[in-house]
Amino acid sequence: DELAFIATLNLLTWKPVIFAANVAEDDLSDDGASNEYVQAVRNFAAENGSEVFVICAQIEQEIAELDDDEKKMFLEDLGLTESGLDKLIAASYRLLGLISYLTAGETETRAWTIKVGTKAPQAAGKIHSDFERGFIKAEVVNYQDLLDCGTYTAAKEKGLVRMEGKEYVVKDGDVVLFRFNV
């Protein structure tokens, strides 16, 4: 009962925490495992239900000045799969229980952020309240499946586009076309 009451107070000390461990470039190769300070932060974070990710601010500064292709090559040369900024975003999403789904039209593709467990009508409501109110169904295809097929039409022809109803829980990386009538 006490914990439930405390949660309603929205105390800053009750909020989830992410620790960014800034290390030298040499400590990135093993994700800071050989760094005693990183291990101390990880132990503290584990005891307190927090997350830790390792970055090198110097490398992040260099990455920020590169275009996408150069950035990818630079990260590969360092043996990294993602930048510290990408790690921060992913950790934030996990800690806050968020996912993204996509909508795509002829002129615009957009990502929408929702809570994990959100059903299709409520996800549609993030775009416009009329979408939620008049929700009929959602045409859903996985992002990677759509990329592999090249076009929405090709994905549909291969049977990868599913019709989902009001109880469908939107998943991270879904590409959704909402059908509604108001």
Regions found by a protein language model. Name each.
Residues 1-171, 176, 181-182:
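C-terminal-of-GTPase-core extension/linker across diverse P-loop GTPases
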